[in-house]
Amino acid sequence: MAIPEEFDILVLGGGSSGSCIAGRLANLDHSLKVGLIEAGENNLNNPWVYLPGIYPRNMKLDSKTASFYTSNPSPHLNGRRAIVPCANILGGGSSINFMMYTRGSASDYDDFEAEGWKTKDLLPLMKKTETYQRACNNPEIHGFEGPIKVSFGNYTYPVCQDFLRATESQGIPYVDDLEDLVTAHGAEHWLKWINRDTGRRSDSAHAFVHSTMRNHDNLYLICNTKVDKIIVEDGRAAAVRTVPSKPLNAKKPTHKVYRARKQIVLSCGTISSPLVLQRSGFGDPIKLRAAGVKPLVNLPGVGRNFQDHYCFFSPYRIKPQYESFDDFVRGDANIQKKVFDQWYANGTGPLATNGIEAGVKIRPTPEELSQMDESFQEGYREYFEDKPDKPVMHYSIIAGFFGDHTKIPPGKYMTMFHFLEYPFSRGSIHITSPDPYATPDFDPGFMNDERDMAPMVWSYKKSRETARKMDHFAGEVTSHHPLFPYSSEARAYEMDLETSNAYGGPLNLTAGLAHGSWTQPLKKPAGRNEGHVTSNQVELHPDIEYDEEDDKAIENYIREHTETTWHCLGTCSIGPREGSKIVKWGGVLDHRSNVYGVKGLKVGDLSVCPDNVGCNTYTTALLIGEKTATLVGEDLGYTGEALDMTVPQFKLGTYEKTGLARF
């Protein structure tokens, strides 16, 4: 299909939000020409996308499906430079993310303080997006006819129930639906963005773009194309200038211009959307001139208010009789053949899950809060106390070692994956040149507010006790835990001798061999009390008592290991142009997502969020996509059923297969 040079609507960026926006608007009126420009490659029927269980591959440093942005050095990370990846493929994060179905809290959207963005306004759009493929007792808050599928996947590792028993013994109650918009403290069997009927990942591009292009001819897809700048004519966004995603000729860049008759929607993501605006002349005039760009609209908030969820991992050894995904991701050919054969036979087995089977959202008890430093206690009172639907931390269990398996010995593992839901820290990103390929000035602000440390330390202690109460537990991976003093009761321990011998087998001559005393095996746990009916009543290892020196070790570990959760947002915030309590540097968009100071230009991606959301952000990205498409439709004069913008269902067997030669 030939690509025209002029469209009615241009959507710049085919990520989770952009794919939704383009697909919906192409189904608003099939006489509208909609263009979708994406920097990454097409994801159509790409096995590295649709096979859920191989998602870690997309996060390797040589990944072709992600771009990696390196920050400035930070004293809050012990001098480290943070690496923040962003998806670089059609579908954006929905093509390569962890597939965790998590909703924000009702107060999250109310806190946007923007007309039309209250949770009561947005709930119909949340329901419109999803097909909830599990039994539930609250159908009034879920959708059952949407293009994106939600299920438990078609496989569950045994670690799920072990984790839930352990968290219950800690006073974290099991909740049937932790994503009900109001529950902020509980544990659940975690749902996934996986289609139960097929075992495939449920990504935004297949759901909205490919399904539409198969059935209608008014949606045009332009991949491997980077947005350089937006061209403004007579106060209106009229066109966009693009370049190839990778420079073909550094001395003579190849530009191409596409025009839009009615609307341009910028959806390049939290990192790239502000950079596009800045190259187009929108931003802080002082910073724009310093970068060699003529200011067009004075909007100091562009690129400010950068937020993320701060993540760290703590891995543990598990007993050899339990199941994990370690042998599969390590490259055991026999295991891989068995797993792939099962999935291709019927869409089930370990490939039909992400291995993240259960997790918690938690708030501290009054006693736990009293033990945290005063700065966080004050922050808690200001931000959390009157919003009981907001969790402070999340952690979940991964059925294997999440990391580079060439760096650890063979064996079986489990990993605790934590993230801070509402950091107080803020960062920024700005262009350094008009060149679209230039490296930006990037300070993500990780941990630059002291109030963020206490809940991170608390969650490490909390999840460690969860691990120690699990039947799977066989010791810490000591290289990936805080370096506690040798004499501390909190120090990490290797596998116990019995487990080492079980892994080694009768012919192994060195299992349990110790070099001096710099590593120690796990102390033998207390025996089971057979008088108890359920194992979650049995405390196998006593709770650890941490002293001040131990806390410093945890803090240092967090500074050295905290990283992005791929959940960044906020750099093109909705808010008053003059600023507000939550948008201190000034809003970039009005409540209808219009960029201040220009006509015909909206932003529709996670960068619009003025404040954080307590969830894995794919849910919010889809919600923003749905909201933006509705706003555009309304602005164009459509009403009633036309705004349903129903997309066709994606069906297998009706599309060409794409090769993997470039991967």
From Swiss-Prot:
GO terms for molecular function: alcohol oxidase activity; flavin adenine dinucleotide binding. It is found in: Peroxisome matrix. GO terms for cellular component: peroxisomal matrix. Keywords: FAD, Flavoprotein, Methanol utilization, Oxidoreductase, Peroxisome. Its cofactor is FAD. PROSITE patterns: GMC_OXRED_1. The keyword Oxidoreductase applies. Pathway: Energy metabolism; methane degradation. FAD binds at residues 8-38. Its EC number is 1.1.3.13. A motif (Microbody targeting signal) lies at residues 661-663. Gene3D superfamilies: FAD/NAD(P)-binding domain, Glucose Oxidase, domain 3. InterPro entries: FAD/NAD-bd_sf, GMC_OxRdtase, GMC_OxRdtase_N, GMC_OxRtase_C. GO terms for biological process: methane catabolic process; methanol metabolic process. The active site is at residue 567. SUPFAM superfamilies: FAD-linked reductases, C-terminal domain, FAD/NAD(P)-binding domain. Induction: Induced by methanol. Subject to strong carbon catabolite repression. It catalyses: a primary alcohol + O2 = an aldehyde + H2O2. Homooctamer. Minor isoform of alcohol oxidase, which catalyzes the oxidation of methanol to formaldehyde and hydrogen peroxide, the first step in the methanol utilization pathway of methylotrophic yeasts. Belongs to the GMC oxidoreductase family. This is Alcohol oxidase 2. The gene is AOX2.
